[in-house]
Regions:
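A generic tandem-repeat structural signature
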Residues: 1, 6-9, 14-24, 30-31
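Surface-exposed loop/turn elements that mediate protein-protein interactions on large endomembrane-trafficking
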Residues: 1-2, 26-48, 73-90, 109-130, ...
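Repeated scaffold domains used in trafficking and secretory/extracellular systems
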Residues: 3-13, 45-60, 90-101, 126-140, ...
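Short coil/turn segments that connect the beta-strands within blades of beta-propeller domains
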Residues: 14-16, 63-65, 101-103, 144-145, ...
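Structural core positions within WD40/WD-like beta-propeller blades
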Residues: 19, 68, 106, 146-149, ...
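Plant-skewed but cross-kingdom recognition/interaction modules and surfaces
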Residues: 26, 58-60, 70
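Short glycine/acidic-enriched loop and turn motifs that connect beta-strands
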Residues: 153-155, 197-198
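Blade-level signature of beta-propeller repeat domains, shared across WD40, Kelch, NHL, RCC1
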Residues: 178-206
């Protein structure tokens, strides 16, 4: 697939569930129980932006109770995967993520209750940068109450927060990162894959 095909391939996984776009429908499937959870017919709108061709984004929440997707320029849709009820979030911003308890959805530096779509104050112990563009970085990874957060640029330090206590546990400024790093939680730590080809593993109590 061409890099400019979409904002990001509409593919995500959380727990035993996976979300993907078939070209006509968004599907959420539970591979643990081998059952389809939710399906919706959508059409991804063509973009006028130079960075990507279509608005085509979807993600699952950490506890797999919600999904979020964007197929047009100025709104996100939150879906309750048990009731299939939808809430529309009017927001043309970038870099969406859920809170660890699935109760809050953040995008474009704003925060919303996932049940109602009502805007709320920042519930996180860290501030979220305002005005970040598509090409800026706001990457968030969640495991239990831990959140690893990187903002501004792909080479910025990664902060590890415990949302339960509100404490900043660590700031990781990996020496092998030049311009970009990808990071993810494993069962026992946080793994960084840098643009130097190095793999760094940081242990943390999960």
């Amino acid at each position: 697939a061409n890099k400019k095909n979409s904002m990001k391939p509409m593919l995500d996984a959380s727990g035993d569930q996976a979300l993907w776009y078939t070209g006509e429908e968004i599907v959420v499937f539970d591979f643990g129980s081998n059952t389809e959870v939710w399906r919706e017919t959508v059409k991804c709108k063509k973009s006028k932006a130079p960075n990507f061709a279509y608005y085509c984004f979807g993600m699952l929440s950490p506890r797999q109770s919600k999904a979020a997707y964007r197929v047009t320029e100025d709104e996100y849709v939150l879906v309750d995967l048990k009731s299939a009820q939808k809430v529309v979030i009017p927001n043309a911003g970038w870099h969406p993520f859920f809170s660890p308890d699935d109760q809050c959805f953040s995008v474009g530096g704003k925060f919303y209750l996932t049940q109602t779509g009502e805007e709320m104050d920042n519930p996180f112990p860290f501030s979220v940068r305002q005005g970040l563009s598509f090409s800026d970085t706001c990457a968030v990874r969640t495991r239990g109450s831990l959140m690893a957060v990187q903002q501004d640029r792909g080479s910025s330090p990664i902060e590890l927060w415990d949302t339960g206590s509100g404490q900043l546990l660590a700031t990781i400024d990996d020496p092998f990162v030049v311009r970009q790093v990808n990071f993810a939680f494993t069962k026992s730590g946080l793994v960084l894959h840098t643009d130097c080809g190095a793999m760094s593993i940081y242990s943390c109590a999960l």
